[in-house]
Design a protein with these regions (language model features):
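Short, internal active-site loops enriched in acidic
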Residues: 39-41, 141-143, 185-189
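Short linear motifs in exposed loops
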Residues: 31, 104, 120, 192-193, ...
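Non-catalytic alpha-helical coupling and interface elements of nucleotide-dependent molecular machines
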Residues: 38, 131, 155-157, 207, ...
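Conserved C-terminal "lid"/linker of ANL adenylate-forming enzymes
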Residues: 136-138, 149-150, 167-219
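AMP-binding/adenylate-forming catalytic core of the ANL superfamily
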Residues: 61, 66-67, 83-84, 89-177
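Catalytic cores of large soluble enzymes that bind and process phosphate-bearing ligands
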Residues: 16, 25, 49-52, 60, ...
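Conserved AMP-binding/adenylate-forming
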Residues: 1-92, 96-97, 106-108
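Structural beta-strand/beta-sheet cores of well-ordered domains, especially the beta-sheet scaffolds
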Residues: 29-31, 53-55, 133, 146-148, ...
Length: 219
C-alpha cells in the first residue's frame, strides 16, 4: 500500500477539486511519495514539484520490491539513479492537505504545445457529463504538438465523429481544448480485467480516422 483514504474524505476532496483525478489519500505510515517533473531520465531523482503541480509519482517504502525478475531494462528505468525511489509509472499531484491524487499513466499523457494533459481528469469529466461508463482521452500528432482527442463509448452509435451535441457537451466540460470527439460502440479493454483501455490502439485509430482513413476500428 502507498496511501489510504476513507470514502467520506474522497467525497469531500472531490467536491473541492472536482477535476483533479482520483484522490487516494495520505501516504500510509512508512511510505514516502514524491511528485517529480514529467519525462526525467534514469540518471538521478529530481527535486519535487510544488503542491498542486502534476508530475510523475515516485514511491519509497521498506516493502517496495527491489527489482523486476529478469527485466533489467524495466528495473533500470524504475529505479532512477540506482536509488531507493521507485518510479510508479503513474502521474498525479499532491494537494495542500498532503493527499495524493492519481491522474493516469505517464505513458498516456497527451504531450501538447500548451503543456501536458493527463487522461483521468478528462475522462472523468466526460463520463460525468454524458453519463457514460467509458471514454478515452488520447493524443494525436507528434510529441510536443499533440492534439487532445476524446473518444466516447456509445454502444448504439456508429464509429466515427460524434454528433454535434456530444461534441459541444464534451468541449464545454473539459478544461483543455479538444481537437475532436469521436464515438465507438466499444473501447478496447484488456481481457483479464475488462477495465484497462488500450489507449495506444485508440490513439492510432483516432489518428487514422482524422486523416481520412478507415473508420471501423480493428478491435
Amino acid at each position: 500500500p502507498v496511501a489510504d483514504v476513507e470514502l467520506s474524505e474522497i467525497e469531500s476532496a472531490e467536491l473541492a477539486e472536482r477535476d483533479g483525478g482520483v484522490c487516494v489519500g495520505l501516504p500510509v505510515a512508512g511510505a514516502e511519495v514524491r511528485i517529480v517533473p514529467l519525462g526525467f531520465g534514469p540518471e538521478s531523482v529530481p527535486e519535487p514539484v510544488a503542491h498542486g503541480v502534476t508530475g510523475e509519482i515516485l514511491v519509497r517504502a521498506p516493502w517496495v520490491s527491489e527489482g523486476y525478475l529478469g527485466l533489467w531494462a524495466t528495473q533500470r528505468a524504475a529505479r532512477p539513479g540506482a536509488g531507493d525511489w521507485h518510479r510508479s509509472g503513474d502521474v498525479g499531484h499532491v494537494d495542500l492537505a498532503g493527499r495524493l491524487w492519481v491522474e493516469g499513466r505517464a505513458a498516456h499523457v497527451v504531450d501538447g504545445a500548451g503543456g501536458p494533459v493527463t487522461s483521468v481528469p478528462v475522462e472523468r469529466a466526460v463520463e460525468r457529463a454524458l453519463g457514460l461508463m467509458r471514454s478515452a482521452a488520447v493524443g494525436v500528432g507528434p510529441a510536443g504538438a499533440q492534439q487532445l482527442v476524446v473518444v466516447v463509448e456509445q454502444p448504439d452509435a456508429d464509429a466515427g465523429p460524434a454528433d454535434a451535441e456530444i461534441m459541444a457537451r464534451v468541449r464545454n466540460e473539459v478544461a483543455h481544448p479538444v481537437a475532436a470527439v469521436l464515438s465507438v460502440p466499444s473501447l478496447p479493454v484488456d481481457v483479464r480485467h475488462n477495465a484497462k483501455i488500450d489507449r495506444a490502439a485508440v490513439a492510432a485509430w483516432a489518428d487514422t480516422v482524422l486523416a481520412g482513413g478507415r473508420v471501423k476500428p480493428n478491435w
